[in-house]
Amino acid sequence: MKIQGTIVDLLVAPLGPGELLLGFVGGGMVRGLVVGLLTWGVALVFAGFQLAHPLVTLGFLLGTAYVFSVLGLATAIWAEKFEQINFFPTFVMLPLTFLGGVFYSISRLPEPWRTISHFNPMVYMVEGLRYGMLGTGALPPALGALILFLLAVGSTAVTYALLARGYKLKQ
């Protein structure tokens, strides 16, 4: 929207930064959850299983979708060209995801890599979802929920500040 110039329509509307944040993040969450649920539905066809802790799974799904949506909005505000939009997902999120225990349990890593992986916020999202879906995880889900909450609060504060200042939006 910003690069195409249609963001002007939203900026002149009587919407505050909180309302813009809520709208963009809500839309991003819905999109992410639909993609995730469709992926899970296809996986059920090939390997049916029961969720070990459905409420924990739902909580981590919502929290993870929220954080990714807020970070996506912050990236969109920061980017000035289409090429820059892919910087954050490609050079930050993708490596953190692959090093975050998606394809392996961090409990199997040798030291010092196990300790280093605890500084990756993606580990806590992955382990929380792993616990909720499979009933097992290398980290306590309460710790993962706390880290996810702190990440959500921090990313929301930064993105809200960017919207409130009109950073790279009002040019």
Q: What does each model-found stretch correspond to?
A:
Residues M1-L15, G28:
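Transmembrane helix boundary and interhelical loop/hinge segments in multi-pass membrane proteins
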Residues A164-Q171:
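Short cytosolic juxtamembrane segments of multi-pass membrane proteins
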Residues I7-L10, V42, F46, T75, ...:
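Hydrophobic alpha-helical interface/terminus motif in multipass membrane transporters
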